[in-house]
Each structure stands twice: as C-alpha cells, then as structure tokens.
C-alpha cells in the first residue's frame, strides 16, 4: 500500500512540475507608451453582405464557380447532356459537372453562367478564364469552347469573344486562356460547351480581369479597391459587422477555411 501511495505522490509531483513549466509571463510596462492614437482617426470595416465580396470587392466574375452553393447549379443554366458529380479533387469543394456528347449531331452540351447581375466586361481589356478539367473516360484529348455572349442583340445570342481549350489528361489539371472582348457589355453571359464528341469534367470555373488592384492574380477589383485606399483609413477591420457570427455556430466566419489554394477554400 505504501508503495502505491509513493508512486501516486511521485506522479502528482511530476504533473505539477510539468504544469509549472508551462507558466507564461505577460508584462505590461505602464510607463512606456506606444504609438499615440489620434482621437480623430477613422477607419473602415468589411462586412460580407449585399454582394460586398462576391460581386463587389472581389474581382471574380463567375457566380458559384465551384458548384458549392446550397443549390449546386445556382447561377448556371445547362443544356444538352450535363450531370452534377460529387467526388471531385478538392475536399472542401467536391462538386463538379460532367459534359458528355448530347447524342444529336445538331445539339451541344454545355452551360451558361449569368454572373452576379450579369458579367461586366470592357472592350480591349483582358480576362483570364481558368478551369480544372479532366477526361474521365481517358482518350487523348477533347475540346471545350468558351464564349462571352451578348444576350440582348436583337433577340439573338451573339458571341463577341471566343477561345478554345484542349483538355488532354485523365488527371485533374488547371487550364487557362485569355479572352479579349471587342465590345463593352455590362451584362454579358459566359458560355462553355463541349466542342468534340467525348466527355469532359469541369471544376472551379473562373473568369477574372487581368488588370486587378496592384496586379494581384485572384485579387481585388481595381476601381473599388483604389477608392477605399484613397480614403486612407487608419484601421481596416476584417471581418466586420454582425455577419462574423453567422446564423449559427456552423456558419460562423471561420478564417482558417479562407486560406490556402483558392480552389479548396
């Protein structure tokens, strides 16, 4: 009995010493002042409501680019043989679309994206289209066609910027191409369709202006960000407002999920 009592005492002492070793000190030097804060200093805070981020400060032009909205095809209109899949390459964003031959020589398979209140583009500016894609059935290559479409031209859908991408791998890979529209259209549509007879999977579809604020790829809309910078705020709070708490604990703003490769955020 004495042996067990001694062992217990030794363990208790060891645990106490371990806890004591983890003690940290925080020293406040009350007589050493830091930078003086002016009572007239003003600042900004960013609350992600009313399209302040997507459709606002963030320069992405595609709505629901990873098919992860609660309604997975919100913002998209499909035509032909399009199916939604849920075993994609990105853990946090597993949904993607599969484009297959429509089975008719005069029909196409594809999808249109409406953007957020339309996809606004300017004549002569460059826009980077990118997509993760693969050939699920193997093969050497398949082609997809990318178009910016004016849906208001005399009741017809007129494509005013077009490019073709060749998907050449059965593994997921990022592809990109530059679109340069010849006209200015504040409410165009992005159209993507299969331009060959096989099957292609598409994930994380993006259309981004090349000319962003300070030239950052995947960056901020140049005019809005510069307008905020010109205010010269003393502080910038992010996240700001009540949206930080979400509607419940599961939907709270978790910054750890907003870093890393953009396709897996």
Give residue ranges: language-model regions:
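Sec/Tat signal peptide C-region and signal peptidase I cleavage site
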Residues: 17-21
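Bacterial N-terminal signal peptides
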Residues: 8-16
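Extracellular and organelle-lumenal recognition/adhesion modules and their flexible linkers in secreted
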Residues: 22-265
